Amino acid sequence: LQNYSEWKKKKFIAEKGLFWQKDGEDGMEISIGGHGFRVTINSYMAAEAATLSKIAHWKNDNQAQALETEACRIKENMFKYLWDPKAEFLKVLSVEKNASLKDVRELHGYTPWAFDLASADYAVAWKFLMNTRHFFAPYGPTTAEQCHPQFKVAYEGHECQWNGPSWPYATSMTLVGLANLLNNQTQSFVDSRDFITLFSIYARSLYKKDANGILTPWIDENLNPFTGDWISRTMLSTRHQKPEERGKDYNHSLFCDLVINGLIGIRPSEEEELDVNPLIPEGYWDYFC
């Protein structure tokens, strides 16, 4: 509760009933959408309030209802103010008065699905995920849509850019959201083949290739979505900037959870039961039953 209260003191704007954040402090530097009311922070805080409400309920704490109400209001305001009906996507809104939504779709727009915050009315947003004009790439998905004029994959400037490169953290959150969508809602925009395609790309990305072409299992910071090169690592090495291996074993991914909870589909429930719903298309593996 103290953590939630501190965030509310510092980042909550009552006029909109939403939290705001700088993109860099959101862990997403040099983004196209930039600072403002972001889908990320509001998804995190709505989910935290909902979780605290459940814990309070189990403890017979009288704060349970207030926290549940707060979680619902954050969720409602997020879709009220950050959903662009024309673009069919959630976007960043600047904190300035009379501001318009930023003109870019960014991968973090899928964050609400990672916490089961989005209703079926918004599933249309997923039609952009596997589209090469938007997010799909050989080592993607990209963190910003590729059709935007500010999309780029740069080897200059700041090492950590969220204006195009693929980030395993963002990919992980997107895959969690996709698994939740496929398990909990009926829609026609994505299916289990899309999940396994994206998950296979994610798994294939977690390597580095040496000068002799030998692949080594590897987790680092951000990826070139078209070549699979670890961008920050290459930039630091080229600049001889210490520590050159600062990104090694970067703890930003959910690989095991995605295999167990998503791919194999072992999903716990509050009823002390396990639901099993594999996201492996029929006939995809001849050794899976």
Regions found by a protein language model. Name each.
Residues 3-36, 76-166, 207-239:
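Extended glycan-interaction surfaces of carbohydrate-active proteins
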Residues 1-19, 38-46, 102, 106, ...:
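Aromatic-rich carbohydrate-recognition surfaces in CAZymes
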Residues 130, 134-135, 160, 177-289:
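Non-catalytic C-terminal accessory modules of carbohydrate-active enzymes
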Residues 1-9, 48, 52-80, 120-135, ...:
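Extended, well-ordered alpha-helical scaffold segments
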Residues 43-62, 111-122, 172-189, 258-267:
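Well-ordered alpha-helical scaffold segments within catalytic/enzyme domains
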Residues 32-43, 62-69, 99-103, 158-165, ...:
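Alpha-helix capping and helix-loop boundary segments enriched in small/acidic/polar residues
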Residues 23-24, 32, 43, 87, ...:
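Solvent-exposed, flexible loop/coil residues
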